[in-house]
Swiss-Prot record:
Family statement: Belongs to the ubiquitin-conjugating enzyme family. FTS subfamily.
SUPFAM superfamilies membership: UBC-like
One Pfam family, short name: UQ_con
Tree of life domain: Eukaryota
Organism: Drosophila erecta (Fruit fly)
Residues of the UBC core domain: 15-178
Identification of the protein by name: Protein crossbronx-like
Range of residues in the leader sequence: none
């Protein structure tokens, strides 16, 4: 008997699972210092954490969740990004801690967009918060700031009282590090856990790093440049890496099943 992938819920679910697995593989390959993984309980709910190494948010460690629409990736609705704690940023709502993606994407297009684009955007707003609120330049050369954002108080503080903004952000960074080792609020085995350094536990890894075979295996002479992205230092570096990854995707794009393809069940 023949079933259409459009009319059979089981086939649609399997197809969605392959899409999400492909998205996860891209996330693992394309990004550094920001991590995301589908939860064990539901592939539409992702756990994430970002380590910020530079800029005024340097030293911050922020956890977040990504909620995919039920019909992902066919649904044009945007993903929902919710941070675990309140964060002072113009694009993060102080009430529900959600990230505004509408300045970045108007709608989701599965043939153009990937979850790693959203993760890259998260990196960008922390690497260059001023750049994230600017829409261009006036005729006099002054930066034009957005009229409306999720957190207007943060926008006004960043634009008019930058020292106070930096002070608040640095206090926030310290608080985020103080809670980095907190016990997880869920027993989901895919929850990203950060543990303190333990010499006994990491001695084998350190020995591997010192061994000639390990150095040879991780030598820059033997590996592709994209494997050595390092941490994000500026929005310029984000743009350069974005261009590199888009070129990589063009060379090896994920094959997508035909939407109307029939599946033969025996």
């Amino acid at each position: 008997m023949w079933y259409s992938t459009e009319s059979n819920p089981r086939i649609a679910l399997i197809k969605q699972g392959y899409h999400i697995l492909a998205e996860y593989n891209l996330v693992k390959e394309e990004l550094k210092n920001i991590y995301a993984i589908p939860s064990y309980a539901c592939a539409l709910h992702w756990f994430g954490v970002i380590f910020v190494h530079s800029g005024i948010y340097a030293g911050s460690v922020f956890r977040f969740s990504i909620l995919l629409p039920e019909n992902f990736p066919d649904d044009v609705s945007l993903l929902t990004v919710v941070f675990s704690t309140g964060i002072l940023h113009p694009h993060i709502c102080p009430q529900n801690r959600t990230l505004d993606l509408e300045h970045f994407l108007k709608e989701w297009r599965k043939d153009q967009h990937h979850i790693w684009h959203v993760l890259r955007y998260i990196q960008a707003i922390f690497a260059d918060p001023e750049g994230s609120i600017c829409t261009g330049q006036s005729s006099s050369g002054d930066l034009v700031v957005m009229d409306e954002v999720r957190n207007m108080e943060a926008l006004n503080m960043l634009a008019q009282s930058r020292p106070e903004y930096i002070k608040r952000v640095q206090e926030q960074a310290i608080a985020s590090r103080n809670h980095i080792y907190d016990r997880p609020l869920t027993d989901d085995p895919h929850y990203i856990i950060v543990e303190p350094y333990c010499a006994d536990r990491h001695l084998k890894i350190m020995d591997q790093l010192k061994s000639p075979c390990w150095k040879e295996a991780t030598s820059m002479d033997c590996s592709q440049p994209s494997e050595y992205l390092g941490h994000i230092d500026s929005s310029r570096q984000l743009d350069e890496e974005e261009a590199n990854q888009l070129e990589k995707l063009r060379r090896a794009r994920i094959p997508e099943p035909h939407r109307d393809e029939a599946v033969d069940f025996l």
